Amino acid sequence: MSTLGLAAAGAANAAVSSPSRPATIGTTLSTTSQAGYEASGRDFRYISSTLTVPDTDFLTEIYPQEYIQLSNGSLGGGDQYVRAGIESCTVAQSFGYSSCPTGDWTSFVEAFNNSLSGPYFSHYSLLSGVSQGDGVNFSIYYNESGNELHFVVTPPSTSGPTQYYKTQAYGAIFPYASAQDDFTDSTGTPIPVPFFLHAFRINQFLQGAITTEHGLRGSFVGPWTTSQIDATSNGLPYPSGTVRVSPSNLWSDGLSANGAVRPYDAFGVWAR
């Protein structure tokens, strides 16, 4: 492990007077179908980012879902998670959003609790008029005292108004926060990422912001452990597995998020 000399302070709608510890970069997490960054080592209540519409019109039989997430298991592997992001209408149709035209993109929000037999809350909003590379801002806020989850989706002005959603949280605790791509088939089922002939950028995550349960703020790094997520040929770390999709290094886009401009708040996801 290595540490970055960064500090994060503050909160979503709250101030913090004590200093926070430096950010920590954790061991890379290897999968067959996911790529991005995951924060762990704290309980989290807020995550936001601007996600760009994927540059993947030429892909067939593979559909990237991109989203921000709070969960009680690494890589969404626990029994509770909440997500907000972008997916293709082809995938959304398989979940009942029949008015989503094939070839277009939609925003979505989703809350999952295994004890409630799967996703208990979901909403879609067609991203009409967007082009590849256009940004859509998403935020998820967990109001623990009110036992509520709040979602905000802000598309480009040409694609409609800001969307607000709220649902119950059912006493959730979220020790993981991530921003990632998840590669699926047309039904939304995760599938191994195939071999690509040429490297290309799939999409970007900008203006990343995370807040812990106790109000410590950061970007994609902060007073927690941040781990890179790679999709490899067999789910094993390189060199045992060949990296097929991975995020770029974290960089700074200079844009304000959650009340401040912070370093290391952006990355791209690349087919390798």
Cite the ranges covered by each PLM segment.
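Exposed, interaction-prone regions of secreted/extracellular proteins
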Residues: 15-272
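Secretory targeting and sorting signals
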Residues: 1-15
